[in-house]
């Protein structure tokens, strides 16, 4: 008999005093600080750097962390508290905790007030994209330049991002080729309009995921057809400090008609600029069709259209030199002091954004799937295709070229930035107490032409560039094959063991007459995961494995054409990893979990893009290790809470090109992170949530040029720690509607996730949801 992790029933606490906890939580501002060091009026405390920094500097990080450990202590000590009768215990299939689904976005139609373990409602606050929803997870780090419409690789799992993590929709990868200013993952193209749940898989212990999954996988599961037709509308409107409006509207419809089922969704997002010129508008359509076939087969078709128009950020500093007073002076006083960005690759001043500089990007995701049971086996086929095009336009700025007035067209370019495609075939079958899985995967990373329709060469001021240099066909293509086999063995009622092997090969080859050197390699990576059910409520999972990360197309190009000139050979990364996870379940909803991990990434790939040095190369290794403690508790029948604390470190070795030697750590990797939240169930089925997040100081190396003749400089910068707090009130209106109000960054904390790009202050808004 297959069995599951046994959990106690939900329990209700009686007669326990918890008021002291709320008074002592400075982040919630529900009581007074006990120290005279923080007794200034609220307005002064929150001004000029944020109250979080002042509190931490006065009290110290140690005491701040202790306060949050007390909240975790409440969760851990729950069994000693008088509780009511336990509910019946559910019995489910045993799973490894490492691969457990730790984040579920509940279907608001069926569970509008759900407080399930790890549940994060996409209807909460202004949430527009996946990073908004995942920011409270212990192993997630964010380094966004803007709050809305950021197209960079802004989300990291355990310190690794970009080409080291994988984003899937229903199991198919959506990572792009990453060339010509594109990014491996553009989170703005994955709206929340048709999402049923999100699975966050930490690390690379699964054989199913290949060369982009060294750090982990974010798997988006779309909504399924329903027996009865459903129609849901959700809309938010808000604004705040220096940002006039943020709009987000979503519409979803699902239905199953005989053998044909479908889900349809559409969304629209719009945000006024917070940073100079950085407005955003997004439009999305998605359709998923399921067709039941004979012999219990299932055919699926998927289509998604995403269009985003965004203004490129204009630099709002008089100087890039931190020692120059102009570094702290703005060109435009209507917008915050901030760095800008450029059209990529930078090829002169026509690629520096002027007034109205913008992208108009359209992306299509096309999918086909077929699943067929064969006796007690299951055959699963997935095929996919990505199509992404960008229209780029830039206009003259008198601040850049004094011979031009503002607003003349200086650059018009079309970029076919992604043409990737691939597929996967997998067979799984039970043999007694064993489940065998074998599969093959193919991915082709590709892009199309870049065509410069117009460039003003006089304005561009780059004599080394000709118009012919700016229009070109793709020079490379990446072909990846993966083969894997895995056996999951239920040894006994308490032991579960999974062993697997994965073989990956890749070739980044030159095409269209390119003289770029080619890269190819292969590797075999073993995986071993063991789970022991200690008691009906206590489970431990341990894993040791290797994971591969192959160089992407941009890395291959800059390895060959950058400062290293293709010597020595660029090697793939290999992560030698170990993880340990323990979880205790108090009930079906309440739990405490401890996780520790260690990564030793050999031949870690460095991508340096300094003003006078561009190149890609291997260093000897990067070590990343850390631990987290998180949990959830139901205190009474009207109050529940969750909390998490994370400690993490990193170390790089063997960087022969780091002549400055300023840091041996990964950039933007905070040592401590803490989050917590409380949920109050109010009369009339209303729900009030308060959540808070602390992020420790982060370091990064800032490279800039100054002087005459121009010299390159490196500076180790530190971003201050910060605390943000959010509140959300949801009130049902009749049977089919809900009204919500929210405040994000409640105390107007001034903070940055990436150096030189400030985040907005207080954002206030309202939401309406209709379900039919």
Task: Give residue ranges: language-model regions.
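Extracytoplasmic beta-strand/coil segments of soluble accessory domains associated
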Residues: 131, 135-173
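Transmembrane beta-barrel wall of Gram-negative outer-membrane proteins
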Residues: 243-270, 275-324, 355-376, 430-432
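Short acidic/polar hinge/loop motifs at secondary-structure boundaries
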Residues: 173-202, 328-330
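Membrane-embedded beta-barrel scaffold of Gram-negative outer-membrane proteins
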Residues: 378-396, 533, 539-545, 572-625, ...
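Gram-negative outer-membrane beta-barrel transporters
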Residues: 234, 490-497, 505-506, 596-600, ...
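N-terminal periplasmic "start-of-domain" segments of outer-membrane beta-barrel proteins
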Residues: 96-130, 154
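Surface-exposed extracellular loop regions of Gram-negative outer-membrane beta-barrel proteins
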Residues: 446-453, 507-509, 518, 532-579, ...
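N-terminal periplasmic accessory domains that precede
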Residues: 130-133, 153-156, 167-170, 184-188, ...
